[in-house]
Amino acid sequence: MKNCPKTLPESEACDGIWPWCSDNTLVQFNVVSDHKSIVDGYAYDSDWGCRNSVFQYNLSYNNDGGFMLVIGTNGWPEDWCVNGNIETKVRYNVSINDGLRNYLTSASHKDTYFSPVMHFTGYTQNTLVENNLFYLFPKPEPQIDRTLFHFTEHDSSYGKGDVFENNYIYAPEMTVAVKEEKSADNKYSGNKFVGSLQIPAAGFEKQEGIFNKSLWYNAEDKNWNILLDFLKDKTIPINGKELKVLDVIGAN
């Protein structure tokens, strides 16, 4: 999916690929780019009432809203849909230059230019975010959001017990790693970054040098080879030129 325009009113939200009130959904081997929906505008979304969703081996780039939304709600009848968002897994994906919204919206977050790379809102429980590559670019305008992971309230609830481990981040300008607000019991470990990242007390480690394969690739983990095979023919536009994704992430 690419080049989704700003056609919907602010009363309607839209993302690239999004299961809703679903169990055991598998989303893999997809590309979403240049999503410009006024509300949301993420490449991927594990939405209300989902359990055990898996998002893996996907590519996302240049999306106004960001790479991904994980959202849970609260207070629904149990025979209609599960409350919250339970055990979504986000693994072995690549996000490049996501989170570009340069305007305010009246629908939500109306006081900020809100577009974190990943947004967790409402009751998200035991989400696992692991072994993803987040390659950030300098934002083209000073007011644009510079946040990697952001938790917010929805239906009077917040995330709890979400796990972030072994993710790899390139941040060429100062970016906030996590805004937790009132979420609780989240865990961070083994995350590595090159560049400038405002980090919590533990779980993120700065690496010197350049962002390339030596930082994140493990030949004994077949998932990396599956991802690289999917990306081998993919290109993205950068400064008017089509560049190979594998070159951007330092895999070649």
Language model features by range: what are they?
Residues D111, T127-V129, F137-E141, T152-N252:
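Acidic, glycine- and Ser/Thr-rich low-complexity intrinsically disordered tracts
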Residues T7-P19, I38-D47, N63-C81, L104-T121, ...:
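Extracellular beta-strand/beta-solenoid scaffold signature
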Residues M1, L8, L26, L59, ...:
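Generic detector of leucine side chains in alpha-helical contexts
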Residues M1-T7, D15-W18, D23-K36, Y42-D45, ...:
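Right-handed parallel beta-helix
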